[in-house]
């Protein structure tokens, strides 16, 4: 919806043309849901960003048992987009590389660890580095590596980190009553560009993932602006 126009003063300060329409926007995840088909086609979506967000939509107004509802009106259609998230997803990788490895490279040192049959010896990562707000509602919960031994390598720890975030997203998915009816999930965000992480997520969820290479919040916001009246 158009809620106003750019004033002469704002135009002079920003360079945006005067009288350009100002369109009511939305948050980054609802915007991403527009261009992935989550909102209008009902296709579940996962955004792998700093946080990991699982989104699905429902007709009309729905108050879910788990997750945050976001009401959307598209034309004459009222939808509810439900968001469930883990707070540390890509953020956990940033912590690992920035604080632990002090490295700018996001590549595994040992490519053998990417083999799906690689023996991980029950090494697990609990990803809630900054609390958990959906299933447990506990801001003080913290992350952990479980199963460490003297032979554990840095690449194994990184694989465990990606697997741990995948299992946390699986826990969110299983909290949605009808998620067993989903036949596929679309994947967006910076983490979606990592082939190994995307495949790990698909394996853990037990469902096909389709990466949306050019979809994201920016594109969704542009579609909102294009459809405004």
PLM feature spans:
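Active-site core segments that coordinate phosphate-bearing ligands/cofactors
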Residues: 7-188, 192-229
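Glycine-rich, mobile lid/loop segments that gate access to catalytic sites or pores
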Residues: 2
């Amino acid at each position: 919806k158009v809620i106003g126009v750019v004033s002469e003063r704002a135009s002079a300060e920003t360079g945006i043309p005067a009288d350009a329409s100002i369109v009511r926007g939305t948050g980054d995840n609802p915007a991403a849901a527009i261009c992935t088909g989550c909102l209008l086609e009902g296709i579940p979506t996962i955004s792998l960003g700093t946080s990991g967000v699982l989104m699905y939509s429902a007709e009309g107004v729905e108050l879910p048992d788990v997750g945050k509802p976001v009401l959307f009106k598209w034309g004459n259609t009222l939808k509810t987009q439900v968001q469930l998230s883990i707070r540390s997803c890509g953020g956990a990788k940033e912590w690992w590389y920035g604080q632990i490895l002090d490295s700018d490279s996001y590549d595994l040192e040992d490519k053998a660890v990417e083999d799906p049959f690689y023996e991980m010896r029950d090494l697990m990562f609990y990803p809630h580095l900054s609390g958990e707000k959906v299933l447990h509602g506990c801001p003080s919960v913290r992350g952990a590596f479980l199963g460490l031994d003297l032979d554990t390598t840095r690449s194994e720890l990184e694989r465990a980190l990606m697997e741990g975030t995948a299992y946390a997203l699986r826990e969110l998915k299983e909290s949605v009553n009808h998620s067993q009816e989903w036949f596929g999930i679309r994947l967006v965000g910076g983490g979606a560009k990592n082939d190994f992480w995307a495949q790990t997520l698909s394996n853990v969820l037990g469902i096909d993932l389709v990466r949306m290479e050019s979809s994201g919040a920016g594109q969704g916001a542009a579609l909102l602006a294009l459809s405004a009246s």
